[in-house]
């Protein structure tokens, strides 16, 4: 299911009692739905995999960000998607920001501007990671995380140029759901990272 959080809940409640394994590719799934999915997966011995992103590069980006985070004091994340993307920032951007902050073990420096000439120009801030979102035609999904420290920056970037980038992860999740009863959240768990 790749609809939305509400659709994901409906699919889980419909499929699990029928002993059908489930793969969900929606973001913004509330904790209550995750708890229900965990309960239903256990009760009916089915595999339920919920992954906010199926692009291997995006999953690896999140992992690399966590490794790099302790060595830097500043972090800015820019995400750009197609104009029909309904949420901002994207679920992947939120996951990258949260994982980056976890890797840091605290908050990054996010100094507010002394004078902001256009409101919101510096973006939103999540645990010190400043997040900027753009929506426009000609894009699929792009995430760029720039770390900063005295005299240096480190950039980690992932670009999904076409939706084909999601297929290897989807196929992996479908194959894994059959072998992995219970709830699994995130493709990183399947990859073992």
Regions found by a protein language model. Give the residues of each.
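Short amphipathic alpha-helical face segments that pack within enzyme cores
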Residues: 56-63, 95, 169
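Short, conserved glycine- and acidic-residue-centered signature motifs
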Residues: 4, 8, 30, 89, ...
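Short, ordered loop/turn segments at secondary-structure junctions
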Residues: 27-29, 53-55, 80-83
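Short glycine- and Lys/Arg-enriched binding-loop motifs that mark or flank ligand-binding interfaces
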Residues: 21, 53, 87
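Rossmann-fold NAD(P)-binding glycine/threonine-rich loop
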Residues: 6-18, 25-48, 59, 63-68
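General beta-strand structural signal in soluble alpha/beta enzymes
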Residues: 24, 48-51, 77-79
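C-terminal substrate-binding/catalytic lobe of Rossmann-fold NAD(P)-dependent oxidoreductases
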Residues: 73-78, 82-193
């Amino acid at each position: 299911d790749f609809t939305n959080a509400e659709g994901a809940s409906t699919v889980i409640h419909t499929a699990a009692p029928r002993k059908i394994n489930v793969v969900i590719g929606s973001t913004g799934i509330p904790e209550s739905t995750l708890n229900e999915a965990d309960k239903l997966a256990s009760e009916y011995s089915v595999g339920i995999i919920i992954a906010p992103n199926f692009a291997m590069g995006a999953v690896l980006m999140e992992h690399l960000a966590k490794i790099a985070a302790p060595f830097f004091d500043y972090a800015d994340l820019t995400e750009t998607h197609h104009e029909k993307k309904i949420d901002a920032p994207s679920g992947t951007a939120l996951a990258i920001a949260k994982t980056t902050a976890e890797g840091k073990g605290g908050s990054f420096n996010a100094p507010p501007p002394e004078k902001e000439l256009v409101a919101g120009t510096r973006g939103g801030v999540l645990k010190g990671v400043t997040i900027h979102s753009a929506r426009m035609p000609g894009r699929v999904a792009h995430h760029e995380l720039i770390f900063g420290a005295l005299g240096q920056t480190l950039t980690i970037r992932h670009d999904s140029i076409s939706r084909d980038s999601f297929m290897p992860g989807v196929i992996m999740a479908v194959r894994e759901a059959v072998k992995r009863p219970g709830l699994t959240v995130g493709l990183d768990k399947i990859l073992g990272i």
